[in-house]
Amino acid sequence: MPRTHAIEDYRNFGIMAHIDAGKTTTTERILYYTGKSHKIGEVHEGAATMDWMEQEQERGITITSAATTCFWRDKRLNIIDTPGHVDFTIEVERSLRVLDGAVCVLDGNQGVEPQTETVWRQADKYDVPRVVFVNKMDKIGADFFKCVADIIDRVAGKPVCLQLPIGSENNFRGVIDLIKMKAIVWSGEALGANFSEEAIPADLAEQAAEYRTKLIEACVEMDDDAMTAYLDGVEPDEDTMRRLVRTAVQRRAFHPVLCGSAFKNKGVQPLLDAVVDYLPSPADRGEIKGIDYKTEEEVVRRPSDAEPFSMLAFKIMDDPHVGTITFCRIYSGKVESGANLLNSTRDKRERVGRMLLMHANNREDIKEAYAGDIVALAGLKDTRTGDTLCDPTKAVILEKMEFPEPVIEIAVEPKSKADQEKLGIALSKLAAEDPSFRVSTDPESGQTILKGMGELHLDIKVDILKRTYKVEANIGQPQVAYREKLTRRTEIDYTHKKQTGGTGQFARVKLVVEPNEPGAGYAFESKIVGGAVPKEYVPGVEKGLNSVLTAGILAGFPVVDIKVELIDGAYHEVDSSALAFEIASRAALREALQKGGSVLLEPVMKVEVVTPEDYTGSVIGDLNSRRGQIQGQDMRGNANVINAMVPLANMFGYVNQLRSFTQGRANFTMQFDHYEEVPRGEAEKVVAKYA
């Protein structure tokens, strides 16, 4: 099937915001007005089209980014709905990587909220042009102008109003279009309510004139001819204004601001017009850089069907009907179902089975896809998030995505053997879908350990295990990954002798054990000369050492950064064996760790708290009570940014406590920084708990 829309007529955009700003409702209205969805889904009824996982519908939050295609004014819109919760920023990050533009939705009452800041910074990182939609203008306390000021103060944005609200709270009835200089008024709140263009109300005429002047002045900055004409007293006409706003958005010179109430069906159609008029097409975004698979030199791929094929996998989902679905953004060339592609990131061949166009969780089979398309592929075996798929004859590796390290872990124990099997399958699927979620096995207890970005992140994963995969399991409390370390050099001479009737056991080892450089890990060297310990027994020595190093001597945690030298020993012709040397070295190392002053190490997190100034004292006091060390603070807009180093053990439950004592106005990020010795009093508690 040939291309139905020119690449210039595509708009690949995401809807991003803080949790509860009305992002999913806005998307639902867009789908309704573009004719894709004939029954509107309300989030608070748990029926939104884009929120199709049970966990999302219950919690009223969006967890996975669903992709959907719709049409407006003969343009093809590919929308990615993204989550707004801090534990799911990975979803936002990977959506932004493949978008050309974004609509940032603000809650008219709350303005720029913590997660808005995070998402805005991520959009800056990927240079994503955006327009702002101030939603919930019908809410008590909604303040359009405070929201505009927030964009300047809190995210250093450059807002320029394209609309002003008419009325507020319960009396919100429409908007003033500053380009047309007309009032757009909706006749009711019902779905598909009609709107009419009217003269601007007299009481708002002066304000409208003032903001139109600001808009014109921002626009003419984009074009020398328009600036010259304006200085000569000629204002740009409507078409010129739209062209100049479009230029400004593409250059990220300013951020156009619109307003409305998605829930009350006001302001959605003008928002769709703004997406079409101002957000870039793939052609506007231009070429993408990559690395040539063979020569490793930089190459470019232009957004054209004639270029060699390349696309990026940005999300993997498990679908009960189709199996694994891989969401991909095509940057260049075209692809047909059945095509053989190269996964250049992993050097694996992949065959495209079914190719699907997604609408939330409905799907439509397609045979061909082109540059600019966002498609879902079924049947890929080895592809993971962030991988490049391309034409094997012109292979390229596109820029990879960066994923943060998990900071929290819980143990999971299946209740039966059948659950054990289901758990294995489910976890491998979940880990493939989400790169910030890791799975490992504890070598001592054999328990399965889940690692993630935060408590809600792991809660949702456990919920999916229980509901979607029907795994019955016991879930442990969140745990800290402690380590043990030797503090001083020590020498041990140990003899293992056991005589029972028949063959006995005999082995003597002399070890020098000392701390290694931080991060250097474990090193073993045999310095035996003259056969004091025969070569065939040295692996037995190493096996004994390893068994102690994996579990330490204090509380069952691995020993890190240690050097062991075998410098002497003795054996017996009849009674010595590899097993005897294993037992001797195990006992020798345990003794060395005791004599050498083993200590516990704990992970220390780099924590950044962004808080309104009123709460700074409370935040610092609370961090100090968690054994935190304040590293410094500075202002960001009107918020205070506090940097601290805090042991992970003291950060469990922090997100909820921070929210409660700052009324949800502070937010924080944390990532692993280094391991540090646990103070003696704390270490005694840890040993008592785990030993």
Curated annotation (Swiss-Prot):
HAMAP family referenced in this protein's UniProt entry, alphabetically: EF_G_EF_2_B
Localization per record: Cytoplasm
Binding, GTP: 17-24, 81-85, 135-138
GO cellular component: cytoplasm
Function: Catalyzes the GTP-dependent ribosomal translocation step during translation elongation. During this step, the ribosome changes from the pre-translocational (PRE) to the post-translocational (POST) state as the newly formed A-site-bound peptidyl-tRNA and P-site-bound deacylated tRNA move to the P and E sites, respectively. Catalyzes the coordinated movement of the two tRNA molecules, the mRNA and conformational changes in the ribosome.
Keywords (A to Z) from UniProt: Cytoplasm, Elongation factor, GTP-binding, Nucleotide-binding, Protein biosynthesis
Stored PANTHER family: RIBOSOME-RELEASING FACTOR 2, MITOCHONDRIAL (PTHR43261:SF1), TRANSLATION ELONGATION FACTOR G-RELATED (PTHR43261)
Predominant place of localization: cytoplasm
Protein encoded by which gene: fusA
Family stated for the protein in its record: Belongs to the TRAFAC class translation factor GTPase superfamily. Classic translation factor GTPase family. EF-G/EF-2 subfamily.
InterPro entries: EF-G-like_DII, EFG_II, EFG_III, EFG_III/V, EFG_IV, EFG_V, EFG_V-like, G_TR_CS
Listed name of the protein: Elongation factor G
Residue ranges of domain tr-type G in the record: 8-283
Organism: Methylobacterium sp. (strain 4-46)
Pfam assignment, any one: EFG_III
Lineage: Bacteria, Pseudomonadati, Pseudomonadota, Alphaproteobacteria, Hyphomicrobiales
Swiss-Prot/TrEMBL GO biological process terms: ribosome disassembly
Top-level taxon of origin: Bacteria
Gene Ontology MF terms in the entry: GTP binding; GTPase activity; translation elongation factor activity
